[in-house]
A protein has these predicted regions:
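Glycine-rich phosphate/pyrophosphate-binding loop regions near the starts of catalytic domains
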Residues: 22, 28-183
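N-terminal amphipathic/basic leader segments beginning at the initiator methionine
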Residues: 1-31
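Glycine-/charge-enriched secondary-structure boundary and capping motifs
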Residues: 2-6, 114, 118-129, 145-152, ...
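Residue-level signature of catalytic and energy-coupling elements of molecular machines
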Residues: 9, 61, 174, 245, ...
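Acidic-glycine-rich active-site phosphate/pyrophosphate-binding loop
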Residues: 51-56, 62-64, 168, 202-205, ...
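Acidic, glycine-rich loop-and-beta core segments that form the ion-binding/anion-interacting portion
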Residues: 173-217
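Buried hydrophobic packing segments
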Residues: 20, 42, 87-88, 193-196, ...
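Hydrophobic face of alpha-helices
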Residues: 17, 116-119, 190
Length: 341
């Protein structure tokens, strides 16, 4: 008996590494030390000496059950963008610049082309956020997972000068809330999505006029990465007072996380367009509005607060980065929380 007989194909592992190398190399930054295949990834911190008090920021996350959708559609080259986005967006909304990323793939069986396709998406997410993909792991789990299934997670590290961290402490009544458009459902709430829609290939290939695409393509749209937008805002000289990445828990859970005691966020629901995928999901699943806002981003993947005098500069900076901004509300004095009106 050998290792392959037990379900672990070492040669397939070697093959997948060879196939993914070209994608990984596209993410390299000058600070990356050494080549691929080492026992650890190395990244020089020489540049951060310019900062007064450098702070490392970290984030780890996965794509939830969105990976199941990728499996059914047999489309694996974008799910990696989601894994990166979920980590680097968290770092960015704290004021950080992503430095590097590591991915972890667990699979029932290593199919080299599929694994390389997943890593292609991870590399694309890294390029969008200017993070180097300096390491990763593909773990074959025979007997623990079905052969055609996998899960994907990642870990990111970023940096910022402590004085430039976005903490919410500068938040005050009169600040304006600006939301940045999402691409769709992003990477949370897919367990509910899978209860509402028939997750067969035939159903996912169904074209919906209101979506302008198939159901599967709309649901699989990669999570938008907001790193460049926040960097553009910073370069415009705007001080962001608070920032929230709208993920699991929607508006009601995530917006309060950016508030300090004694401040309340007021969001005007009609100030921006709710994406068609959310309207379809609510209709097909008979989901009430409060549950939708308590679960999904509803078309806004990130919400930030700035001084009223900085609104125009912030809007222009976001547009310059290729994102779509909306003035969606304000900060008031009051009990910490969020009001949707």
């Amino acid at each position: 008996m050998d290792y392959k007989t037990s379900g672990v194909d070492i040669e397939a592992g070697y093959r997948s590494v060879e196939l993914m190398k070209k994608y990984v190399k596209e993410t390299m930054r000058p600070e990356v030390l050494g080549g691929l295949g080492g026992f650890s990834g190395a990244f020089s911190l020489a540049k951060i000496k310019e900062m007064e008090e450098p702070v490392l920021l970290s984030g780890t996350d996965g794509c939830g059950t969105k990976v199941k959708l990728a499996m059914v559609m047999d489309k694996h080259d974008t799910i990696g963008i989601d894994a990166v986005a979920m980590c680097v967006n968290d770092i960015a909304c704290a004021g950080g610049e992503p430095l590097f990323f590591l991915d972890y793939i667990a699979c029932g069986k290593n199919y080299p082309e599929k694994i390389a396709s997943i890593v292609k998406g991870v590399a694309e997410g890294c390029k969008q956020s200017d993070a180097a993909l300096i390491g990763g792991e593909t773990a074959e789990h025979p007997g623990l997972m079905p052969e055609d299934e996998y899960d994907l997670a990642g870990f990111a590290v970023g940096v910022c000068d402590k004085k430039e961290m976005i903490t919410g402490e500068e938040l005050k009544a009169g600040d304006v809330l600006i939301g940045m458009a999402s691409t769709g459902v992003h990477s949370n709430g897919f367990s509910l999505v899978r209860k509402v829609f028939d997750m067969t290939k035939e159903s996912l290939d169904t074209y919906y006029e209101e979506l302008g695409t198939t159901l599967g393509e709309a649901l699989l749209a990669p999570t938008r990465i907001y790193v460049k937008a926040l960097k553009s805002i910073k370069n415009a000289g705007v001080r962001v007072h608070a920032c929230s990445h709208i993920t699991g828990g929607g508006f009601y859970e995530n917006i309060p996380r950016m508030l300090k005691e004694g401040t309340r966020a007021v969001v005007e629901k009609n100030s921006y367009p709710v994406l068609p995928i959310f309207k379809l999901l609510a209709e097909k699943g008979n989901i009430d509005e409060q549950m939708m806002y308590n679960t999904y981003n509803m078309g806004l993947g990130m919400i930030l607060a700035v001084d009223a005098a900085d609104v125009d500069k912030t809007m222009e900076a976001i547009k310059a980065a290729g994102d779509t901004p909306y003035v969606v509300g304000r900060i008031e004095d009051g009990e910490k929380g969020v009001t949707l009106c």
